[in-house]
Amino acid sequence: AMFIDLFDESKDVYERIDAFKLGSSKLLERYGNGAAQHYQLENAITTYLWLRYPDRYYIYKFSEVKVVAAELEADYRFKKGAYADNVRNFIKLYDEICSMLQTDQELINLLRAQLTDTCYPDPELRTLTIDVGFYISRY
């Protein structure tokens, strides 16, 4: 039921993420045998969303998006513990980056030239956007 609710596109994305975290905490409490952590945080949960809907979602990583926003001098702010605002701002920022990438035909052609029949074609460039964010955050 947790994944069904997470993938319910009729609800706000952060509300779904938060509900998944809460459900994970309940499962940990009930079945965790004293384990301290369930590891179902925003990074893992957005990965599930991206794997299910690769043309709609990006993979969130707080440390990465914070650097990306700073490097691009974006108006979005990311603060530790501000989970809802951080995820919502992350999606807005990456949507902006993705929109810019979609206008760069040279980059799109470079991407397409590298794809094989076994590669996901990434028609909406969400995966490319994740890769660009990763690159910005590291270099």
Language-model segments: what does each one mean?
Residues 1-40:
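Helix-hairpin-helix/helix-loop-helix acidic hairpins
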Residues 5, 19-22, 26, 66-70, ...:
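Charged/polar, solvent-exposed surface patches and flexible loops
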Residues 11, 21, 26, 30, ...:
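Context-gated lysine
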Residues 71-81:
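Inter-helical turn/loop segments and adjacent helix faces that build the functional surface
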